[in-house]
Amino acid sequence: MKGKTVKESSLVSSHLMLMEHSGNFLFVNNRPIGMVHGGKIMTLMDEIAGMVGAKHSGRHVATAVIEKMQFFAPIFIGNKMILKSSVNYTGTTSMEIGIRSEAEDLITGKITHTNSCYLVAVAIDDYGKPCKVPQIIPETDDDKRRFKEAKIRNNKRLEERNS
């Protein structure tokens, strides 16, 4: 099975955050003010990770682990949410996928790093069983750093699972 580079399976997506993405909001000067619900952010991050995993493996994938979901800053209604996602590391049947979320204030243009997480997806064959994935080929220094860090995280996950 031929490997794939990080850029071959990475994705970037944008979403306008609307009132229905918020748990609560109010109007100030006829503008909706409120924060996007964390569950909506997590859903969008899981969805893009699934797309990256499918793009990399050529298979449907199942989420096995969502690790280290961190919320650094809120995303507000009216912001553009930007998701950047790529495969950091591959095992035999699984892939660690890194996701970075940013919020862009469309009025000021200011971009804020809001969330990050790692997700492990498992490729699934036509019978619902885990199947092999192409190995990731890190090219850039950043790709290589992410690969090295992801390998350490993967080894820790394996240790925890086997203890």
Which residue stretches match the model-derived regions?
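Terminal targeting signals and extreme-terminal segments of soluble enzymes
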Residues: 1-163
